[in-house]
Design a protein with these regions (language model features):
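Juxtamembrane intracellular "pre-TM" segments in multi-pass secondary transporters
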Residues: 3-27, 67
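Extracytoplasmic gate region of multi-pass secondary transporters
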Residues: 20-61, 73-109
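Transmembrane alpha-helical segments of major facilitator superfamily
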Residues: 106-117, 198-199
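Helix-to-loop junctions at the C-terminal end of transmembrane segments
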Residues: 119-132
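Structural signature of the two symmetry-related core transmembrane helices
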Residues: 135-149
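Helix-loop junctions at membrane interfaces in 12-TM secondary transporters
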Residues: 152-162
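Intracellular juxtamembrane helix-capping segments at the cytosolic ends
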Residues: 171-186
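A membrane-interface helix-boundary motif in multi-pass transporters
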Residues: 209-226
């Protein structure tokens, strides 16, 4: 195989060097679990919010003939952050984002989790001008653990807020782990980067395990132990 600059790339030799590089190997492992955690967190946000905030019970109390406005007003009274989101949607004319079902109400928290993820990406970018990236990474990882405990043990809005907080903590993870893992690889960077990207397979593995835990325990909260 030939690289971009015409040099010959020996795949087997490169692979052996990568395997012997502990920093790289642990980078791939970290990325595997990082991506797995991201998708596992986001995949169950809707169901988690539905259970913790009892959207099914709230809408059932309104009856089948409830109007769309009645549904939104009932959901607005459950939790203040979502209420502000609904107010914003109405202000900007984004009525399609207003929930009409319990699942759509849960999806509100999924949307807000993604918004928080994006906001925190920019916040972390600014922070890296003043704080070393690895320190921010460690801090966010520890904070994510605390939020995860809150997600598993918390009740109602508190648990939902903790779950959304995990999303914010994950914003810096992928690019930072990727950069640290490829540090010092030199000519092995291209192949090393491909394996780092392949670590996204963690999403397929951890979400399956999380689903099994949820089914076996009958608790979506317990599933976040994964």
């Amino acid at each position: 195989e030939t690289g971009e600059k015409g040099e010959k790339v020996e795949f087997a030799a490169t692979l052996r060097r990568l395997i012997r590089n502990k920093n790289y190997v642990w980078g791939v492992v970290a990325q595997f679990f990082n991506i797995g955690a991201q998708i596992a967190v986001w995949s169950f946000v809707i169901r988690y919010a539905m259970v913790q905030l009892d959207f099914d019970g709230v809408l059932a109390s309104l009856g089948d003939s409830a109007s769309a406005d009645a549904v939104v007003n009932a959901l607005r009274g459950i939790e203040p952050v979502a209420a502000m989101f609904y107010d914003g949607c109405e202000w900007f004319g984004l009525d399609d984002l207003l929930p009409r079902t319990a699942e759509q109400a849960g999806a509100t928290y999924y949307i807000m989790s993604l918004i928080l993820f994006v906001i925190m990406r920019f916040v972390c970018t600014v922070m890296m001008k003043y704080v070393r990236a690895y320190k921010i990474l460690i801090g966010l990882a520890l904070l994510a653990v605390i939020f995860c405990l809150g997600t598993m043990l918390g009740k109602g809005s508190f648990g939902v807020y903790c779950l959304m907080g995990i999303s914010g903590c994950m914003s810096l993870m992928f690019p930072t782990i990727y950069g640290f893992g490829l540090t010092g690889l030199g000519n092995d960077t291209k192949i090393g980067g491909s394996f780092m990207v392949m670590a996204i397979a963690g999403a397929a593995v951890l979400t399956q395990i999380q689903g099994i835990v949820s089914d076996q325990t009958g608790s979506i909260m317990a599933a976040y132990v994964v």
